Amino acid sequence: MIKKTSLLLALLMTTSIAFTSETPDGFLKDSVEEISSLVTKYKDRFETDEEFLRDKMNSSVMPKLDIKLMSKIILGKKIWTDMSESQKDDFVEAFQYRMTSTYMKSITAFDGEKVVFLPYEPGKRENIAYVKSKYLIPGGDIAVDYRLIKKSEEWKVYDIIFDGISLMKNYRADFREHVSHNGIESLITSLRE
């Protein structure tokens, strides 16, 4: 399941095209098409050149996620507001590093799997959307849903739900427990390892 989760997150995140007036489901469809062509073009190099892969992830993938919003959601209002600006910046950077490290290898596992997207559901606010999808992979389909926010005319993903399990909720439980026992500085250090 971890490998499938990593693959699906990598599929979602990879795109280098600027989407300014795209619908959220269109943004996700284009992202999957982009990963397919990116992997086709660079698969061998991705498997052997970790620095190149990390650079591609950081320049093309991570900008499509709202890492700062994800950080706030994961840590919660109390912890976030108690942190200094420097700690907030350090956490966001460390969390992005961890996300990149965790998911960059799974990009090479993409092998043209088919994805079906349902039309997006608007959120309570016009800049929020929810998109349901199904990844058709050998061994069984996986339901993957996305929560997106529109900022500066661009859609960004801030949560991914795999078979009903929120990525943010999983991180939230682990990270908050770590902070309660060891403090925020310890969590930041562990994310950088």
Language-model features: where?
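Surface-exposed, charged secondary-structure patches
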Residues: S101-I142
